[in-house]
């Protein structure tokens, strides 16, 4: 088995690459950690990896064949994705990589579809007794309300709407927007909960972090806390069919 690892969309994830390198050599002294990026020269993490490869955009029809070729030529045994837009295409091609003895650290396709479409995500959470913001009729709204795209990422196209004047026709006409009650941050604290699931689909680790500062939808400054959230989540999401590796869930909790 090949022990080299490749981390995709390296970007600014310097600490992540360094952690993988430091850990990997404890088990396989000669193993290397490679990276990919659309623009390696401008990716800080590329410079701390053992080599960075320029790749196409993940939505390009040739992306998978290019990535597979890189993996074969560099004896890659594991692919570690880092952004949510990669997950669907990698999950769809998981078997292709497995057939070439390459493990893709991504959950099964059905679970990825649940996560990538917030309409499905809401149904999933409710089935596991986790409350979600109530849906709002955009033509008969109660203010304030919140709107976000069902397939959104990086905190883009979000709308905090305080009154009828702010509910513009452009917002009403956007077919991707979901409308819901606004959750007041003065009443609830916001957390990102990092979780790790094994190949048996059972949770192995739960780490809640209070979200203090956000950058492009990701927590930039946070505080790790031990709180009732750990037991709350363990009781409800102890096992998720098709879930493997790292996932995170964002919650409001008081």
Model-predicted segments: where are they?
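ATP-binding N-terminal substructure of ATP-dependent carboxylate-amine bond-forming enzymes
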Residues: 1-105
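Flexible, glycine-rich phosphate/dinucleotide-binding loops
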Residues: 14, 42, 153, 167, ...
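Short gly/pro/ser/thr-enriched loop/turn and capping motifs at secondary-structure boundaries
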Residues: 41-43, 87, 110-114, 214
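Short, charged, surface-exposed secondary-structure boundary motifs
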Residues: 63-66, 107, 113-117, 216
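Active-site nucleotide/adenylate-binding loops and adjacent lid/helix of ATP-dependent enzymes
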Residues: 109-187, 197-202, 227
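Phosphate-binding site of ATP-dependent enzymes
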Residues: 162-243, 252-253
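Catalytic phosphate/metal-binding cores of nucleic-acid and nucleotide-processing enzymes, i.e., regions
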Residues: 249
């Amino acid at each position: 088995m090949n022990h080299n690892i490749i981390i995709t969309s390296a970007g600014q994830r310097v600490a992540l690459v360094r952690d993988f390198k430091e850990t990997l050599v404890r088990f396989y002294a000669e193993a290397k950690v490679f990276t990919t990026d659309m623009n390696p020269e401008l990716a800080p993490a590329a410079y701390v990896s053992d080599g960075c490869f320029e790749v196409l955009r993940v939505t390009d029809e040739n992306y998978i064949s290019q990535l597979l070729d890189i993996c074969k030529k560099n004896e890659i045994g594991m692919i570690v994705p880092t952004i949510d837009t990669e997950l669907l295409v990698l999950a769809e091609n998981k078997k292709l990589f497995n057939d070439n003895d390459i493990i893709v650290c991504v959950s099964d396709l059905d679970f990825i579809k649940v996560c990538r479409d917030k309409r499905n995500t809401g149904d999933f959470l409710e089935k596991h007794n986790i409350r979600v913001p109530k849906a709002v009729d955009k033509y008969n709204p109660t203010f304030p309300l919140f709107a976000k795209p069902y397939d959104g990422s990086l905190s883009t196209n979000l709308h905090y709407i305080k009154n009828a004047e702010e509910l513009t026709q452009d917002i009403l006409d956007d077919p991707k927007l979901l409308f819901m009650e606004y959750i007041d941050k003065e009443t609830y604290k916001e957390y990102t909960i990092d979780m790790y699931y094994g190949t048996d689909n059972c949770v192995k680790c739960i780490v809640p972090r209070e979200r203090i500062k956000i950058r492009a939808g990701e927590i930039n400054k946070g505080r790790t806390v031990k709180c009732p959230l750990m037991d709350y989540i363990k009781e409800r999401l102890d096992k998720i069919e098709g879930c493997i590796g790292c996932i995170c869930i964002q919650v409001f909790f008081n």
